[in-house]
Amino acid sequence: MTRQANARLRLEHLRSGVPLPPTVEPWVFGRAGILTHLADLLDTVAAKSGRTYALAANYGDGKTHTLRALWHLASQRNFVVSTIALTRETPLDRLDRIYPKLIADTYLPGAAQPGIARLVLGLDADSPESHRLLEWARTELHPKLHAVLHNLLEGQSTEATEVLLGDLERMDLGVADLKRIHRTNFHTALKAPRFSALRDVRDYLRLVDYLIRLRGYAGWVILFDEVELVGRLGRVGRAKSYANIGRLAIDGLGTGHVLPVFAVASNFYTDVLLRRNDQQLAPDWLAVRGDAEAVEACRRGIALLQEAHLLQPLSPANWQQFLQNLIDAHESAYDWSSGLTGQSLWELVRAITTETDTKVRVRLRLAIQWLDLLHQYGRPPTIRTVHGIGEVDVSEEPEAAAAAEDDPAAAAPSAATEDER
């Protein structure tokens, strides 16, 4: 990609608020403290065992941008990185729905496209790694997963490869179809117990974690965005979501070298945890069901969200650095000279957005729009301030009254109309 194309790509994504593609490294200013701490956590995960982290910020103040910066930090340190934004379709209380979306946005270091196929396809069926993997899967995972790996690594049917790989990424292969593939490959019947995606999804997570370490990568970073959407679930859904967060914090849902990172809105504590009294009620809802493990995990998950590290506002110096990069990109993208510096553009933006709590996203888009207008018209845009907003009566009565004053005859009903009534 040329320098001009790269600059235009950055500007279009900044205008729209959509994160850059994972392969494009973002600009990062004012986050050195958090990234240094996360770098230490990555070292610990690679050398010892899993850790967890949560960060909080207001909407539009850079949570997703910081996650993308961590994405690149982890990738540079030989970590596999997965990203998922919670939605109505992928709620945190349903890990069976989370898993396929998570794997669909999983990148190996240096990869231009997502996916985990390379973790398996690079294994030789007769290699010690393959034998170790199959033996571990036989004793530690659901028999279905062992059968999938057995057929994938040692089976003779190449037609089934895509189907078997698809199951590792989406959990969508039925046991009946797996038995058919197994009989084709080995001419023997496969005995496999019932598989439940909701119950056994943990084994898929454990398998990916094992494959990552087996193939020589440092570990696995999982980035959860929009965690505040947990607050839109019902009370049971919220309790289960907190428990899953807690399980990821306690032991990574049975994984070894994993760093889950949760990005949550800063008002989640007051608007959800306090207002709905989830700190007390959520563990109680699980206790009624007699699940002591879930109760402890729920408390741990709530504590993690309570202690989320708050993103600090960008300083004027950070803004000037960021805006200087923005000016350079804009001038490179459209081959012109603005005559502005990061400091002068910051003064213009700050004069318009005087509120101290103005969103980072608002100021950034304002700066881009200023440069766009300056480039298009050759002069700085004129700023008009509107003082006061009044209510406007949009009902039909005032218009009808005004019409009656202008033309009384038109407003009076005709005789025919009276007869019809």
Regions found by a protein language model. Give the residues of each.
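A short, basic N-terminal segment
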Residues: 1-51, 380-421
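The catalytic "switch" region of P-loop NTPases
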Residues: 2-6, 178-341
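Electropositive, surface-exposed helix/loop patches at the edges of structured domains
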Residues: 7, 108-145
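Walker A/P-loop nucleotide-binding motif
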Residues: 48-69
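Conserved catalytic segments around the Walker B and adjacent sensor/switch elements
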Residues: 73-91, 307
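Conserved NTP-binding/hydrolysis module of P-loop NTPases
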Residues: 93-114
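Conserved P-loop NTPase mechanochemical-coupling segment
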Residues: 130-202, 231-232
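C-terminal alpha-helical "lid" subdomain
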Residues: 158-181, 297-421
